[in-house]
Design a protein with these regions (language model features):
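Conserved N-terminal catalytic core of the sugar/cofactor nucleotidyltransferase
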Residues: 2, 6-9, 14-96, 102-112
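Conserved core of the sugar-phosphate nucleotidyltransferase
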Residues: 104-201
């Protein structure tokens, strides 16, 4: 019997056996970064009660419901519009609810560094993960050369040259051999003003 079902997708399940679902672990990762009242969830109408049960600290007004699941862009635009009404200077972190993050302190460090960057830069920031193998299950981010990056703390924030769809094995091996390719984590950071400009273009 599958662990994840349409009635209870994997984000609502304790996949790791920690006593917390992936959704709860996602919210927990932002403790100390974002107060619970500033966490927003965009989900399908059918999962409203699951979200409320698993994240009881989130205000009902922060659970945005879609009548049916659409692609990511309209979800982000809708959430950004709602958040801007409450805080025109807000910084946004967009993440999936079903990620598994093993090194939470490092995750928090990267997110904090990213927030500091988007506070002062009119840029969209995405998180890339250093690839450890030729993985075909992830999309990739191709970055520009090192000298084109902006130093930020101990790490380098690099300009994106392009996004690559999930590759076949041969292409993934070529990415690793070439260097300058990262796994696409699907996490984005930006100021609400920046995302509004991006959607108006």
């Amino acid at each position: 019997w599958p662990m994840s079902t349409p009635e209870r997708p994997k984000q609502f399940i304790d996949v790791l056996g920690t006593g917390h679902t992936l959704l709860q672990l996602t919210a927990d990762r932002f403790e100390g970064i974002c107060p619970v009242e500033n966490i927003w969830v965009v989900t399908s109408v059918r999962y409203r009660e699951l979200v409320k049960a698993q994240l009881p600290g989130i205000p009902d007004s922060n659970i945005l419901l879609e009548p049916c699941m659409r692609n990511t862009a309209p979800c982000i635009a809708y959430a950004a519009w709602k958040i801007k009404k409450k805080d025109p200077q807000a910084n946004l972190i967009v993440t999936a609810a079903d990620h598994i993050v093993m090194d939470v302190p490092e995750f928090k460090r990267v997110i904090r560094e990213g927030i500091d960057f988007v506070k002062s830069e009119d840029r969209i920031l995405t998180i890339g993960m250093w690839p450890t193998r030729p993985e075909t299950g992830y999309g990739y981010i191709k970055v520009k050369q090192e000298e084109d990056g902006a130093k930020s703390g101990a790490k380098v924030i690099r300009e994106v040259e392009g996004f690559k769809e999930k590759p076949d094995l041969k292409t993934a091996e070529a990415y690793l051999a070439a260097g300058g390719y990262y796994w696409n984590a699907g996490i984005f950071l930006w100021n609400v003003r920046t995302v509004e400009k991006a959607y108006r273009r």
